[in-house]
């Protein structure tokens, strides 16, 4: 009836703590944003870049992998730097618990928690107004911890 009465949809945002960057599903110029902040990044393959950043109010830097096509960000994955996995004391269960606690501090209790969903490994999910956070362990070439940010479809 009155088009001006329609509520405008809010653009979903994922905030990176440091450097202070806001990503939306439609952010297609993030490479120029990274260059503006003089952030070293790696083009792993066409449609996938990685870089180090601080997220979730966590004191240590994590790696962000952005999977994208020319029109939008498909999803963001967050993982520890390679050096972390190469430590003799690395324990995937300890790592999972630590990141889980960080996510609980940031988002509260997970909406979904299973102790043995994928090959007996834990899985958690949070839903915000902007995106879904999936944190899980899966076994491809040995156990791997995954943390994915998926924007809601608009």
Residue ranges with predicted function:
Residues 1-122, 138-154:
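Short helix/turn-capping signatures at newly exposed starts of structured segments
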């Amino acid at each position: 009836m009155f088009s001006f009465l329609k509520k405008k949809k809010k653009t979903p945002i994922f905030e990176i703590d440091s450097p202070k960057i806001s990503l939306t599903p439609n952010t297609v110029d993030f490479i120029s944003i990274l260059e503006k902040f003089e952030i070293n990044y790696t083009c792993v393959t066409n449609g996938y870049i990685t870089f180090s950043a601080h997220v979730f109010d966590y004191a240590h830097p994590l790696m962000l992998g952005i999977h994208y096509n020319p029109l939008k960000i498909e999803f963001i994955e967050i993982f520890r730097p390679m050096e972390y996995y190469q430590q003799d004391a690395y324990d995937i269960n300890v790592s999972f618990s630590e990141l889980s606690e960080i996510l609980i501090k940031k988002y509260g209790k997970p909406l979904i928690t299973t102790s043995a969903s994928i090959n007996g490994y834990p899985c958690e999910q949070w839903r915000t107004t902007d995106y879904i956070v999936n944190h899980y362990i899966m076994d491809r070439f040995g156990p791997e911890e995954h943390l994915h940010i998926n924007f809601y479809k608009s």
